[in-house]
């Protein structure tokens, strides 16, 4: 390949540089045209010096030039310039040269993109063109149509429209085109033309634009030359446009007429530079050369060659005339730190530069033309290079040597970015960065020839200043090693879109068809909501706007521009190896859509789709009928720690905890109501048996005496003063289950209790607040096989993937500017079908194809992988009432949760009957005798517990006003779940409205900012107690406190002997007024407010806890395969396994409650002397003693538990309206409201937009019961279940056998209250209890066929302990739920606190054993008795079997006190301490999980407008429309040259492949999915709407049969869905019919690029289509929307108009009127529609034809003036004519000459759309006898 390179830095040439013989050959072989190639000056031929219209003079390239009187002269060209010439004038006597140069000095307007010159043949095909702008294009097309448009040489990274002067030289030689820019930068591109191309000489040359092109060159031009020699381009800066410090030769467009050194004779003749040594190597003698290695692929690098010590031998000696040291005025050098030098630089020798032609090479063909066939380009560059110093020179003389400093300076100023980010560009500078500077060095492309060997060393060059050295270009040197990579350039500016390509091939067959109908399931469309932060609701957008947004989204993804320009040139690296092939280019511009592909084959059954994104909540479902309580489901997985839940119902009593260490003494609590009997104390030593004495008379209450030895239990004394807390006694044996005490008053909220055991699954709670998404959980075990879901809708295009491996084709350059639409070529022969191309990127979502015929059902596919756990589904229809399921086995205990909030106390049960007397226990062994201890005073504080966090002493609160107790309201039915609303601002307080129907609980809104402190409210009920603080300083003894809270019932002690029934005691004295209680819990909810307006849809909440299994959903169509998801959480437990072997017997169950009294046994023999008897029955009360002295006030007791909710107080009067507060924090979630009254059925909503894919539906309900399978093997340990709500109490079990007594342990330090340990293994279940009441309704499942109830499942295996949950805040009290079924008996509760003794009653006589009495009323509290001395703990013996109760033994003597025993076991908890100050507000807890959905209410009110349905399938093809009328007259082209019709043109080049055609029809539906587990008719209301389309009509005949099995309602639903889909499709792609009008013709063309020109309906203002109108759509003209003048406005026939005056408007003529316009049917177009049409248009045009006879319409050729030009009145009342409107031009002006009948066609083509259409015309040249005129008004066309 021969590429000639000429630089201003001359090649050094010495005497031995060129062998004389070779020089002689060069001169002899030079053809004549190479010696005198005459340039043609286009500016001269276009008459620029006479300044035609649109051309003015201006200053040129150099403001001052040496040897010149003034600046260079240039011409400024505006948009008004229209310049062309016949091509014959360019080469009058010869053909257009095959190889030529185009030379120009030009400064284009910044940011413009237009053709500087265009050469057309006779057929109007552009054959040569030069486009200026960013990434300029050289257009070339020879007589064979080569190269095609996609192969036009493009020069990316170069910006010629940066508003600066550029000297541009283009050399076309063989199959290369070389661009030399500003004498420094050279880029070579491959030109794929034929071997002997022909350019027609009979066409025209246009300057500044192309035919029918809107872009017109604007800027300054100084020179434009065509030279029939490709080498002239290399000398442009020497001979044609030298630097400003050099005089200009008198060549074309000379600036200085004085002759200079180019003209030795000074005779002024035109001097044309000859090229004596520029010869084609193929014409020279072929000399053999040494074998050369193939040259590596030239890299894109700027090379500074190493110093060459030998000049090339071929270079002849030529005088040098340029002064390379004087570059300061050269605009091309900008702000360079230019290094002047007197030295000359040597490019690499020929051999190193890789000239391979004419050299025999074993690796290359020797055919001299072979180099021209290779589509590669080698670019030779040589910036600067120094020769080696001659022996006499000093090294320092090398002023031009490239030092590091030089390179650094060059780097700093090297990029002179031509791109100005402030230019008219819609891309921000950050997205683009600077373009490639126009003065950057050469870019390499392609593969060079083989590398030659190094030549012999030459002699130093002899150079005299002023000599012009013209050497032939040296061959390319080997590429250097790659320099360091330059910094990545910023992204280039996005190119304009290219021309539309030809239609593509038919699309591939359509995708596989939808999966077959689901197993009698139904999918309803739900709108897809975007996730993310909750934003405000946006405006409703039309379908077209949403489509535009989707297109914009696609475009945004495609906005990534091509790679930016190359980075700064690195320092020269060593030679690099050849690069591999470039990356594959990006896809070309998309052609028009291809024809629809053939219908694809039926698709196979789709795999289950991957889990889609979670959708927003669906539309509210229809309320279902109330269903029965469902069977108990399997234990679910443990949920994430939720936010603080609502206050739960009281749970069952937990088992007693281990004894804690002794706590610090708390303050005395208020005296509570009488508790149940406490546990028995430790057994005393045997005393002598005394007969029971009669009760003595009541004595006076004395002072507490010294404690005597412990005697038998005496009669109940009066309550003494509160004593100090005694040391805890040893733990006694658990007694039998005590009777349930009477209901206590509701105390204050206690401290949070320890977490209880997990209860059975409670009823679904209300939806909680929406929490933030939690962290990803661990992988759960795989769940059971879910049903196959419908495939989701097609997803949006994914983000760009990472770049693939290098491909073959090079990277696509920057997007070119749009090409101009060529004439339609002759249709080519059909090419062979090419190999299938690689898969393209996903296009935007195509319209859904029509359904294909159903295929045969395929075989059932293999079971898919288990899907991830779905999110809870929407409410389903209620199922039928199922039988009550049996209670499942308890699961393994979960791990301890965090301490939960204390629940509200449960309702106390009725008092139980008294148990029978228990058997007497065996006597324990005697304890070790202790050392006698000193007499003990009142016990001191116990051992200090572990230090707690010290709470500050709380101030005593003021006394509160107790509120009256209100009756509890009845529990309301659960309402339906509503859409979560966004939190509104707090409104002003309104009057309390009547209670509205309860709303559905929405998810918790976001936390608002803390509002300002409100005014003090009425005292609330007591609040929950705070955490226990450290004990405060003991206060003075306080007044007697209120009764303390009721203690928990203790375990029953062994029953004592039956005592005498006492009379009911007198009521005790009224206690003193208590201290003010702390703030109570919130009161009962007020009446519900009226329903608010429906809020906007909230953001999608986090994935809720797994719902109970819903009904099995229908199988969905297969989704596209998504990317593999993250490893999902552990799935739910698997299905029941096979029957396992019988397990080992379980551990012993818990002790049962005591049994009924047995029959009385026979009297046994007297037993051995018994141990000390149990505490006797309460004796009769003694008489009341005198009032004791008022004791010191005791320490303040702890807050009691909150009392029961009081009655609703009367509403107070409405207060004054307060100032508006700040929004408060979100309130607690309200209670589930009652279902609203049934509403009317809503009308069918309008079709909404296609929603994105909804979430996968939840799991369907259990299927029909299968046959009992064998016992499955034990499953793996499941995750811990969530804490269930309290189960219903079960029946009492049989009493268990008494366990053996364990030994008493030593007394331990009192520990902190331990957390409840996990429950032991479950005992065998008790007998089945009676059926309980129905529980609360379950949450509705998703819509499905209701399933028959299955039998109770086998109990699942117990899960492992779950991790402890975070501590939740105290919840609000919930409403009492309806009683659940009876639960299993709970374990014994902890021992209750000792109740105060009651007053003594009178002695009764021995009565007969009565029947079990009713529960007695609560007795008054007794005073605390004195504290006895602490006995020594005995050594516990093993528990014996419970013996028959023996008689009471005699009292034994007290044993001697033993030594201090070790600390006893943990005593019961001390009394609650004082309420501490409120601690700091804790961190917000984790958001709670969304509760289960409440049961469906009755039918609601009419719903809001429905969400848009999915896109319907396209309707059947309409009938062939009537052929439209022919289009309006198009704008005439520029005047062509008259000539005979030419021969038929060559076949046009094939355009780029169009986009893939629409997918073919989907195949038949696949086989039905797996059947639903139950088939029942779906309760669908059979209301008919206008969308009622029989679904069978939408199927092919063969397909209809497969739907016959569906329930009656399915057909209607499918018909409605299909109708919705069709309507949405038509909204997205309007058809231009009266019912489905487009917005404009441009809109219609974008949707249907294949529509022909014709009449269509448009509705610019959208909305209702009733006001649409019919227009003519000119798609050929780019989608113009045309309206026509009415019949009377179409014009007037030619006549002389004798009665009218020139200069008057046509509307003032007798036969005239204002012009008005109508649509294609003759109806006037409304003002509003015209206004919208103008708003939607960027330009408008209208033609007016003036038919004349000797009358001027526009220009008067005789005078050259426009004084008589027609004037127009625009729609905006603006007068327009030649003198004030540049947008009117005469396409044909035959009337200018005033000769005979002629016509003038005026075109108004204006961006000021408000001027069009014209409404009146003024004619100015008529009235003489010989003058006539008429006119025709064309349509007004608007282009978007």
From Swiss-Prot:
Main location: secreted
Residue stretches of biased makeup (Gly residues): 1296-1305
Keywords for the protein's UniProt record, in alphabetical order: Collagen, Extracellular matrix, Heparin-binding, Hydroxylation, Repeat, Secreted, Signal, Sulfation
Biased composition (Pro residues): 472-487, 689-698, 1108-1117, 1382-1400, 1456-1471, 1528-1543
Residues where 4-hydroxyproline is found: 572, 578, 623, 641, 650, 656, 659, 677, 680, 692, 698, 707, 719, 722, 728, 734, 752, 758, 764, 767, 773, 782, 791, 818, 836, 872, 875, 878, 890, 893, 905, 908, 932, 947, 1019, 1022, 1025, 1031, 1223, 1226, 1469, 1472
Comp. bias intervals (Low complexity): 335-352, 376-386, 508-523, 561-572, 673-688, 724-743, 749-758, 910-919, 973-992, 1001-1013, 1090-1106, 1261-1270, 1487-1496, 1544-1556
Example of a GO cellular component annotation carried by this entry: extracellular space
Post-translational modification 3-hydroxyproline, affected residues: 682, 688
Record PTM: Hydroxylation on proline residues within the sequence motif, GXPG, is most likely to be 4-hydroxy as this fits the requirement for 4-hydroxylation in vertebrates.
UniProt-annotated stretches for the region Disordered: 242-523, 528-547, 561-1576
Annotated Laminin G-like domain residues: 72-244
Family named by the database record: Belongs to the fibrillar collagen family.
Complexes and interactors: Trimers of two alpha 1(V) and one alpha 2(V) chains in most tissues and trimers of one alpha 1(V), one alpha 2(V), and one alpha 3(V) chains in placenta. Interacts with CSPG4.
Name listed for the protein in its UniProt record: Collagen alpha-1(V) chain
Protein species of origin: Cricetulus longicaudatus (Long-tailed dwarf hamster)
């Amino acid at each position: 390949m021969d590429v000639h390179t000429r630089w201003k830095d001359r090649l050094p040439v010495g005497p031995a540089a060129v062998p004389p013989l070779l020089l002689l050959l060069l001169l002899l072989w030079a053809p004549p045209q190479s010696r005198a190639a005459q340039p043609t000056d286009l500016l001269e031929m276009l008459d620029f010096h006479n300044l035609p219209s649109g051309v003015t003079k201006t200053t040129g390239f150099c403001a001052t030039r040496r040897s010149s009187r003034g600046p260079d002269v240039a011409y400024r060209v505006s948009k008004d310039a229209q310049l062309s010439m016949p091509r014959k004038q360019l080469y009058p006597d010869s053909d257009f040269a095959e190889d030529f140069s185009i030379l120009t000095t030009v400064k284009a307007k910044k940011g413009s993109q237009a053709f500087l010159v265009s050469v057309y043949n006779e057929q109007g095909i552009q054959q040569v063109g030069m486009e200026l702008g960013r990434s300029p294009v050289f257009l070339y097309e020879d007589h064979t149509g080569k190269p095609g448009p996609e192969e036009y040489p493009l020069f990316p990274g170069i910006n010629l429209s940066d508003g600066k002067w550029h000297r541009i030289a283009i050399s076309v030689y063989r199959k290369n085109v070389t661009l030399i820019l500003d004498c420094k930068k050279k880029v070579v591109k491959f030109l794929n033309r034929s071997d002997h191309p022909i350019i027609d000489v009979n066409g025209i040359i246009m300057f500044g634009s192309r035919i029918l092109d809107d872009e017109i060159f604007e800027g300054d031009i100084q020179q434009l030359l065509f030279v029939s020699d490709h080498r002239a381009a290399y000398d442009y800066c020497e001979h044609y446009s030298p630097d400003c410090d050099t005089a200009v030769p008198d060549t074309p467009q000379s600036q200085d007429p004085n002759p200079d050194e180019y003209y030795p004779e000074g005779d002024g003749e035109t001097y044309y530079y000859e090229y004596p040594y520029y010869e084609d190597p193929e014409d020279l003698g072929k000399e053999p050369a040494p074998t050369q290695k193939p040259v590596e692929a030239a890299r894109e690098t700027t090379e500074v060659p190493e110093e060459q010590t030998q000049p090339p031998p071929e270079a002849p000696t030529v005088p040098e005339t340029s002064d390379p040291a004087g570059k300061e005025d050269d605009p091309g050098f900008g702000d360079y730190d230019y290094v002047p030098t007197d030295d000359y630089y040597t490019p690499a020798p020929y051999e190193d530069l890789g000239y391979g032609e004419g050299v025999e090479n074993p690796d290359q063909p020797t055919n001299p033309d072979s180099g021209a066939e290779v589509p590669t380009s080698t670019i030779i560059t040589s910036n600067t290079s120094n020769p080696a110093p001659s022996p006499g020179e000093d090294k320092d003389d090398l002023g031009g040597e490239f030092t590091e400093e030089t390179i650094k300076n060059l780097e700093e100023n090297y990029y002179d970015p031509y791109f100005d980010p402030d230019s008219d560009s819609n891309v921000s500078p950050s997205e683009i960065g600077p373009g490639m500077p126009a003065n950057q060095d050469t870019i390499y492309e392609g593969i060079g020839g083989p590398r030659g060997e190094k030549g012999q060393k030459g002699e130093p060059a002899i150079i005299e200043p002023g000599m012009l050295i013209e050497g032939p270009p040296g061959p390319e040197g080997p590429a250097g090693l790659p320099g360091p990579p330059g910094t990545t350039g910023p992204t280039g500016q996005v190119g304009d879109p290219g021309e539309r390509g030809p239609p593509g091939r038919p699309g591939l067959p359509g995708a596989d068809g939808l999966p077959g109908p689901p197993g009698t399931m139904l999918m309803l469309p739900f709108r897809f909501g975007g996730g993310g932060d909750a934003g405000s609701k946006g405006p409703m957008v039309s379908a077209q706007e949403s489509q535009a947004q989707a297109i914009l989204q696609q475009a945004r993804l495609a906005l990534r521009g091509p790679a930016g320009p190359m980075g700064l040139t690195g320092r020269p690296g060593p030679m690099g190896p050849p690069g591999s092939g470039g990356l594959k280019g990006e896809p070309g511009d998309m052609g028009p859509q291809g024809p629809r592909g053939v219908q694809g084959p039926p698709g196979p059954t789709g795999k289950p789709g991957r889990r889609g994104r979670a959708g927003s909540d669906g539309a509210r479902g229809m309320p279902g009928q109330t269903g029965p309580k469902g069977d108990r489901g399997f234990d679910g997985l443990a949920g994430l720690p939720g936010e603080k839940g609502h206050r739960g119902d009281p749970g069952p009593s937990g088992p007693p905890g281990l004894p804690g260490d002794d706590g610090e003494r708390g303050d005395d609590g208020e005296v509570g109501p009488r508790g149940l009997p406490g546990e028995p104390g430790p057994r005393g030593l045997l005393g002598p048996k005394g007969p029971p004495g009669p009760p003595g008379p009541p004595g006076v209450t004395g002072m507490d005496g010294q404690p005597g030895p412990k005697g038998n239990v005496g009669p109940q004394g009066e309550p003494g003063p509160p004593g100090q807390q005694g040391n805890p006694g040893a733990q006694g044996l658990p007694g039998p289950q005590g009777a349930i005490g009477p209901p206590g008053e509701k105390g204050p909220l206690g401290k949070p209790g320890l977490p209880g055991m997990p209860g059975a699954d409670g009823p679904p709670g209300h939806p909680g607040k929406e929490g933030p998404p939690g962290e990803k959980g661990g992988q759960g075990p795989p769940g059971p096989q879910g049903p196959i879901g419908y495939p989701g809708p097609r997803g949006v295009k994914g983000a760009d993937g990472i770049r693939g491996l290098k491909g073959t084709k090079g990277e696509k350059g920057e997007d070119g500017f749009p090409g101009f639409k060529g004439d339609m070529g002759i249709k080519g022969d059909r090419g062979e079908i090419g190999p299938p191309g690689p898969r393209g990127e996903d296009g935007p979502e195509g319209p859904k194809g029509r359904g294909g015929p159903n295929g045969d059902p395929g075989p059932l596919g293999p079971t898919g992988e288990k899907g991830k756990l779905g999110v809870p589904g929407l409410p389903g229809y209620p199922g039928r009432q199922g039988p009550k399921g049996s209670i499942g086995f308890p699961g393994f205990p979960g791990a301890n949760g965090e301490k939960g909030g204390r629940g509200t106390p449960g309702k106390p049960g009725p008092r139980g009957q008294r148990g029978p007397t228990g058997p007497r226990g065996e006597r324990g062994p005697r304890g070790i005798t202790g050392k006698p201890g000193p007499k003990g005073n009142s016990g001191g504080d116990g051992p200090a517990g572990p230090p707690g966090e010290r709470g500050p002493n709380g101030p005593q609160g003021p006394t509160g006003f107790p509120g009256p107790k209100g009756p509890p309201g009845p529990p309301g039915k659960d309402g339906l779940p509503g859409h979560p609303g966004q939190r509104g601002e707090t409104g002003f307080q309104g009057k309390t409205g009547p209670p509205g129907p309860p709303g559905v609980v929405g998810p918790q809104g976001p936390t608002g900012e803390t509002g300002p402190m409100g005014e003090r409210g009425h005292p609330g009920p007591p609040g929950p107690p705070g955490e226990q603080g450290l004990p405060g300083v003991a206060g003075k003894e306080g007044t007697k406190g209120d009764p303390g809270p009721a203690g928990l019932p203790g375990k029953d002690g062994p029953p004592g002997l039956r005592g005498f029934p006492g009379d009911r005691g007198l009521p005790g004295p009224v206690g003193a007024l208590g201290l003010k209680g702390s703030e109570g819990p919130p009161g009962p909810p007020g009446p519900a407010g009226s329903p608010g307006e429906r809020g906007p849809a909230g953001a999608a909440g986090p994935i809720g806890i797994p719902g109970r299994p819903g009904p099995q959903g229908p199988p969905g169509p297969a989704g596209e395969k998504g990317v593999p998801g993250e490893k999902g959480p552990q799935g739910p437990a698997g299905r029941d396994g096979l029957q396992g072997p019988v397990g080992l017997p379980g551990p012993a169950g818990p002790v049962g409650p005591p049994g009924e009294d047995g029959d009385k046994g026979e009297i046994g023999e007297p037993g051995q002397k018994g141990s000390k008897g149990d505490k006797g029955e309460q004796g009769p009360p003694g008489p009341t003693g005198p009032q004791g002295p008022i004791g010191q006030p005791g320490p303040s007791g702890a807050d009691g538990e909150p009392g029961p909710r009081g009655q609703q107080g009367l509403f107070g009067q409405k207060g004054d309206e307060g100032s508006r507060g700040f929004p408060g924090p979100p309130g607690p979630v309200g209670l589930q409201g009652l279902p609203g009254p049934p509403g009317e059925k809503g009308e069918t909503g309008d079709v909404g937009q296609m929603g994105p894919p909804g979430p996968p539906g939840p799991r369907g309900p259990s299927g029909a019961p299968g046959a009992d399978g064998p016992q499955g093997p034990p499953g793996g340990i499941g995750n811990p279940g969530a804490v269930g709500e309290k189960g219903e109490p079960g029946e009492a079990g049989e009493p268990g056998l008494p366990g053996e007594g364990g030994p008493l342990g030593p007394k331990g330090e009192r520990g902190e209250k331990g957390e409840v340990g996990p429950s032991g293994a479950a005992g065998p279940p008790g007998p089945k209890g009676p059926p309980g009441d129905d529980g609360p309704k379950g949450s509705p499942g998703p819509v499905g066929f209701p399933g028959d109830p299955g039998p109770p499942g086998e109990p699942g295996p117990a899960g492992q302990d779950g991790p402890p949950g975070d501590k939740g805040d105290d919840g609000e009290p919930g409403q009492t739920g309806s009683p659940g079924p009876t639960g299993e008996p709970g374990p014994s509760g902890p021992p209750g606190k000792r109740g105060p003794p009651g007053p003594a009653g009178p002695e009764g006589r021995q009565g007969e054993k009565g029947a079990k009495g009713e529960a007695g009323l609560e007795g008054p509290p007794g005073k605390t008795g004195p504290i006895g001395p602490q006995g020594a703990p005995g050594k516990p013996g093993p528990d014996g079997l419970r013996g028959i109760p023996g008689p009471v033994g005699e009292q034994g003597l007290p044993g001697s006190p033993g030594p201090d025993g070790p600390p006893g076991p943990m005593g019961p908890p001390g009394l609650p301490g004082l309420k501490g100050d409120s601690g700091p507000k804790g961190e917000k807890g984790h958001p709670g999980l969304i509760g289960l959905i409440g049961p469906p209410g009755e039918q609601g009110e009419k719903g809001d407008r429905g969400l848009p349905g999915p896109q319907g399938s396209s309707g059947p093809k309409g009938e062939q429309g009537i052929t439209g009328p022919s289009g309006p007259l198009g704008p005439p082209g520029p005047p062509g040259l008259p000539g005979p019709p030419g021969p038929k043109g060559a076949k046009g080049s094939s355009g780029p492949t169009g986009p893939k055609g629409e997918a073919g029809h989907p195949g038949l539906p696949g086989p039905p999915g797996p059947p639903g587990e139950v088939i029942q008719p779906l309760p669908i209301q059979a209301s008919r709407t206008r969308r009622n389309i029989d679904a069978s009509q939408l199927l092919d005949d063969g397909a209809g049969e497969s739907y016959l099995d569906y329930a009656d309602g399915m057909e209607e639903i499918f018909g409605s869905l299909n109708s919705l889909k069709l309507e949405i499709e038509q909204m997205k792609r309007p058809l231009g019919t009266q019912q489905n009008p487009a917005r404009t013709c441009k809109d219609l063309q974008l949707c249907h690029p294949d529509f022909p020109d014709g009449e269509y309906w448009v509705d610019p203002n959208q909305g209702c289509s009733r006001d649409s109108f019919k227009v003519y759509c000119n798609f050929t003209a780019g989608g113009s929307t045309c309206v026509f003048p009415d019949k009377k406005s179409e014009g007037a026939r030619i006549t002389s108009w004798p009665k009218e005056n020139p200069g008057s408007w046509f509307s003032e003529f007798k036969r005239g009127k204002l012009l008005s316009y109508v649509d294609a049917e003759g109806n006037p177009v409304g003002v509003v529609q015209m206004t919208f049409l103008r708003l939607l248009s960027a330009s408008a045009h209208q033609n007016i034809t003036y038919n004349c006879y000797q009358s001027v319409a526009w220009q008067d050729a005789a005078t050259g003036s426009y004084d008589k030009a027609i004037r127009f009145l625009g729609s905006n009342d603006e007068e327009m004519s030649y003198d004030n409107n540049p947008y009117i031009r005469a396409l044909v002006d035959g009337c200018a000459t005033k000769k005979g009948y002629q016509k003038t066609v005026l075109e108004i083509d204006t961006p000021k759309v408000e001027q069009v259409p014209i409404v009146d015309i003024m004619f100015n040249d008529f009235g003489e006898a010989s003058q006539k005129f008429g006119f025709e008004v064309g349509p007004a066309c608007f282009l978007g």
